[in-house]
């Protein structure tokens, strides 16, 4: 039991040491993205951005250009010796479709219409086979029984009756 409490305390201490002591605000003005700090901003990785006249504000560029990166603020008035980092990741989908109720209804209606047209095409194609006669024509083309089978002679004592020529049948 002591090992589990020690392990949970160790995990908690590790997680708390990674928590930022202060927040770094991200602003969106019109179509641009800005990172604000009380003191100074340091670029770590990603979009470099442009420092404005005061070094407390970093312009990351237009939202539509997907700004992303990691930035560090070097302390605030309260936390002078602390550093805090923020990760910015914008994903502007330029070729996406907004799925409002009208768009979803349009997709469903066009899907039903396309399915019905496909079913109609299959029905028309499968319903009219070319080169095949109807069922009535099949029965007329059959041969009569007399022409296909040879009649057996009167029953003999042999195990099987002998097949002979076209003898007259006894009816």
From Swiss-Prot:
GO cellular component, one term: alpha-beta T cell receptor complex
Compartments in which it is found: Cell membrane
TM region(s), chain numbering: 106-126
SUPFAM superfamilies recorded: Immunoglobulin
Protein name, UniProt field: T-cell surface glycoprotein CD3 delta chain
Source organism (scientific name): Homo sapiens
Disulfide bond sites: 37-73
Tissue expression summary: CD3D is mostly present on T-lymphocytes with its TCR-CD3 partners. Present also in fetal NK-cells.
Record PTM text: Phosphorylated on Tyr residues after T-cell receptor triggering by LCK in association with CD4/CD8.
Positions in the Cytoplasmic compartment: 127-171
Glycosylation sites: 38, 74
Membrane-related topology note: Single-pass type I membrane protein
InterPro entries per record: CD3_esu/gsu/dsu, Ig-like_dom_sf, Ig-like_fold, Ig_4, Phos_immunorcpt_sig_ITAM
Residues with the Phosphotyrosine modification: 149, 160
């Amino acid at each position: 039991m002591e090992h589990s409490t020690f392990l949970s305390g160790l995990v908690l201490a590790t997680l708390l040491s990674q928590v930022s002591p202060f927040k770094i605000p991200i602003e969106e003005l019109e179509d641009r993205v800005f990172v604000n700090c009380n003191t100074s901003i340091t670029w770590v990785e990603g979009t470099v951005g442009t420092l404005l006249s005061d070094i407390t504000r970093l312009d990351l560029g237009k939202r539509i250009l997907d700004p992303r990166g990691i930035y560090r603020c070097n302390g605030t008035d309260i936390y002078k010796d602390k550093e805090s980092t923020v990760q910015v990741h914008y994903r502007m989908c330029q070729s996406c479709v907004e799925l409002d109720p009208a768009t979803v209804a349009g997709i469903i209606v066009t899907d039903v219409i396309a399915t019905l047209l496909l079913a109609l095409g299959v029905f028309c194609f499968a319903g009219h086979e070319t080169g095949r006669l109807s069922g009535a024509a099949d029965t007329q083309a059959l041969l009569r029984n007399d022409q296909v089978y040879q009649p057996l002679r009167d029953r003999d004592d042999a195990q099987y009756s002998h097949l002979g020529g076209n003898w007259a049948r006894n009816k």
